[in-house]
Amino acid sequence: MNNSRILINNLKIFQGINQNVINLLLILFGTLLLTISAKVQVPFWPVPMTMQTFVVFLIGATYSVRLSFLTLVAYLFEGAMGLPVFAAGGGIVYLTGPTAGYLYGMTIAVVVISWFANEGYSSSYLKSFISIIIGSIIIFALGVFYLGSIIGYNKALQAGLLPFIPSELFKIALAVLLIPTLKKILK
């Protein structure tokens, strides 16, 4: 892994620690943030929101492509093994259930956002917006597509996309405002 591309490695607390240990700690920290963000619901209109996609955006913007991918794979593995990391619990059923497409979409989105960040797309608000909006589209496209294969595509749009647009726009705006600042802090 190219250490210069992992912004979070620049923190002084990691100086002198073996890179493999750092990577493991970052993966565990990422899965912890994903779990907490899946469990905590924030009142919002028209439906309550979790901050899970926001955490995906931050992981993608601050971790390397490989580390961000491994973090999401570890998160899915923890859930598949029965750990209650997902919004409604854990177990292999969540990887094939109605929301599985969103989970797989987050895994692809974090890699895409990380790739953009490694190409300099986290250095400005506009570039951050581009990478985050692409990531969000990936999450919802896969989520709605998979959900639609179960309940029908019209219902999937009505239940799995439209109610979440306001809260997703809020999370995108928050991430776009925060990522360039994080990049400056972590340099």
What residue spans do the PLM features occupy?
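Short helix-perturbing small/polar motifs within transmembrane alpha-helices
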Residues: N2-Q15, L28-F29, I36, I92-F140
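Generic alpha-helical transmembrane segments of integral inner-membrane proteins
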Residues: L28, L32, I36, L58, ...
